[in-house]
Amino acid sequence: MSGRRLKRAAWNPPLAFLLPLPNNGIVLTRNNARLTLDGARAILAVAEKKAREIKVPQNIAVVDEGGHLLAFARMDGAKLSSIEVALTKARAAALRRAPTGPSPSSGEPSILLSLGLPLATEGKLTCIRGGLPLLVEGQCVGGIGVSAGTEDEDVLVAQAGVVELAKVAS
């Protein structure tokens, strides 16, 4: 009996093919800009140069739009404890499509947000400043995260990378 049921089930095609497609069956795709390894390296090089200018050795991470690592540099003398922080900042900026840090309305992160966001995301997101989204024509193609200096120094170095992307993307 169970063999018979299986046999019958095998002949029943899935009903998904009966559902209508949106747009009268026309499937639309969109050309999306992508951050390449060469682009990530160019961003990283400029950010690293800025870190040298301000004399703060930094950990710098560049990720794609999905938060996956494309390029990373740990400058000589950068804090080892900040490696994962830089990656988390880059990932958070890319995935949230927004700079890391307190929300513009509050100005200061609440203790709940500061602790809750990393805990709720198993350490994958942060509200510490120093992560910026990388945008091309309004589309997020990745993120840059910088850590080892003060939050202001981290943001300054990350901004240098964002400016470089604007140059190479135009």
Regions found by a protein language model. Give the residues of each.
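Basic polycationic patches enriched in arginine
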Residues: 4-8
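Flexible, solvent-exposed loop/hinge segments and secondary-structure transition points
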Residues: 20-170
